[in-house]
């Protein structure tokens, strides 16, 4: 055991930079002499030498990097060959993109302002609405946008700019507008002209988009093709494709009635094609407001303005929030959303059957009715098979003023809780109270007070809307 040293001796000792091997091993206080006093006392003075230290890795790296830096200028000097500087194709493209790419990228706001003409009066001037079956039968094509340039293979340098065109393509559905040209001021005098070919296919996100069209033609052809007939043109009957693979809610409920059957047959459930739903939405609006031969010129003009206002409320105010939330969704997310919807719908139906309630109707965010209660059928006179055995929309059972009010509240306020100073009803995050005129089986309308509730998924996307209707009877 090592003898304890007095305090005076401990204070007089001074540490040294390097100990001998013996003192280092035994953790003893060594001195600067060689041999040290500890080794002399133990008669091992012949082997007393400094402890060799390992080279630090940090020092080794610094020495290596310094030596490399010293050698670099020499190598550069020997490798440089005097002569003219030649730019590689990669360098030229890089410099060209740096000079002109920022100037040529159009923002989403600019594109919407330049392509929203079909939302105004052009949407309701001449032509006819096509059958939604073209959404399925016509193969998709790419969107080609050019500005009178020469290189068709170059694309946007910014992935965000390309994504803006992709989202815009999904919104307005210009699937085959290969002749579309988005010009920019003084584009002929600028050298860095940007071309976009095959930015996005119309079916890039077919189950998410709010697309209206997938047919060809330019913007003008699009306006003519999807506009409402003028006074001089004859109204044509709009046919519905009976061969479309659409499973009505009535038939779906016959196949799956309980939660157990739902889990057994969940592999057969497919994502709902909301794109076709929005196509039929516009078709239904056209039939309700315009497709009447008894309308005079003044009434027809007012109806056209009303339809244009409704379409704007969907595309301008609703899609901005919807696309920002659902831009990263894939088809698997839509499948999960559909499974959640159907399972939630089973719970709602079970609750309405067990508990006596007010007349209830449940519909998707497109307005497609999924369920009506027995009280609703008793109130309106329509049977469940009449309503649920086809693609029915909730606004089909309202008058024109209620339809306009419906789109103002559902698409502009309730879906994403957008504030509105003009709203004359109390509301919260998930429900609101309002009034509407409900269509009865005999063709008349019944004034009702309504409570509309929204059910959202985990991404805060509206999935189901529930409407409670309480009739208001005038007391004389």
UniProtKB/Swiss-Prot annotation:
InterPro entries: ERT1_acuK_gluconeogen_tf, PAS, PAS-like_dom_sf, PAS_13, Zn2-C6_fun-type_DNA-bd_sf, Zn2Cys6_DnaBD. It is found in: Nucleus. Residues 347-417 form the PAS domain. Residues 48-73 are annotated as: Disordered. Its main location: nucleus. CDD domains: GAL4, PAS. It comes from the Eukaryota. GO terms for biological process: cellular response to starvation. Pfam families: PAS_13 (PF24990), Zn_clus (PF00172). Keywords: DNA-binding, Metal-binding, Nucleus, Transcription, Transcription regulation, Zinc. Residues 20-48 bind DNA. GO terms for cellular component: nucleus. Belongs to the ERT1/acuK family. This is Glucose starvation modulator protein 1.
């Amino acid at each position: 055991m090592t003898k304890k040293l007095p305090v005076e001796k401990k204070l007089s000792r001074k540490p040294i930079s390097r100990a001998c091997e013996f003192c280092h091993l035994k953790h003893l206080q060594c001195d600067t002499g060689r041999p040290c006093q500890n080794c002399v006392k133990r008669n091992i003075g012949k082997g007393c030498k400094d402890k060799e230290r390992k080279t630090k890795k940090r020092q080794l790296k610094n020495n290596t990097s310094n030596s490399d830096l010293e050698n670099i200028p020499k190598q550069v000097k020997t490798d440089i060959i005097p002569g003219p500087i030649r730019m590689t194709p990669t360098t030229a493209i890089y410099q060209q993109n740096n000079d002109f790419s920022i100037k040529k990228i159009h923002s989403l706001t600019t594109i919407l302002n330049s392509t929203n003409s079909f939302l105004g009066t052009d949407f309701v001037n001449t032509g006819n609405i096509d059958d939604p079956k073209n959404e399925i039968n016509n193969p998709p094509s790419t969107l080609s946008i050019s500005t009178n340039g020469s290189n068709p293979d170059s694309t946007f340098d910014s992935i965000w700019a390309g994504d803006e065109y992709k989202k815009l393509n999904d919104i307005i559905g210009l699937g085959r507008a290969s002749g579309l040209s988005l010009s920019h001021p003084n584009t002929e005098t600028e050298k860095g002209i940007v071309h976009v070919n095959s930015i996005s296919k119309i079916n890039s996100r077919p189950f998410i988009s709010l697309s209206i069209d997938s047919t060809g033609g330019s913007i003008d052809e699009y306006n003519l093709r999807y506009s409402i007939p003028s006074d001089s043109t004859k109204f044509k009957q709009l046919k519905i494709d009976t061969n479309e693979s659409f499973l009505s809610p009535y038939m779906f409920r016959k196949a799956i009635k309980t939660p157990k059957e739902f889990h057994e047959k969940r592999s057969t459930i497919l994502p709902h094609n909301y794109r076709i739903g929005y196509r039929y939405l516009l078709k239904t609006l056209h039939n309700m407001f315009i497709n009447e031969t008894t309308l005079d010129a003044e009434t027809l003009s007012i109806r056209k303005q009303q339809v244009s206002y409704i379409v704007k409320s969907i595309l301008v105010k609703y899609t901005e929030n919807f696309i920002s939330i659902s831009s990263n969704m894939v088809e698997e997310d839509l499948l999960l959303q559909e499974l959640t919807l159907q399972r939630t719908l089973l719970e709602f139906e079970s609750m309405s059957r067990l508990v006596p309630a007010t007349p209830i109707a449940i519909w998707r965010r497109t307005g497609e009715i999924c369920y009506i209660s027995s009280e609703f059928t008793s109130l309106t006179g329509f049977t469940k098979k009449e309503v649920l055995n086809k693609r029915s929309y909730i606004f089909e059972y309202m008058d024109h003023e209620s339809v306009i009010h419906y789109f103002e509240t559902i698409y502009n306020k309730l879906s994403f809780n957008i504030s509105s100073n003009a709203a004359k009803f109390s509301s919260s995050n998930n429900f609101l109270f309002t009034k509407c005129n409900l269509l009865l089986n005999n063709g008349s309308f019944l004034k009702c007070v309504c409570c509309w509730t929204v059910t959202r998924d985990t991404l805060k996307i509206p999935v189901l809307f529930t409407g409670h209707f309480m009739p208001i009877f005038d007391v004389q």
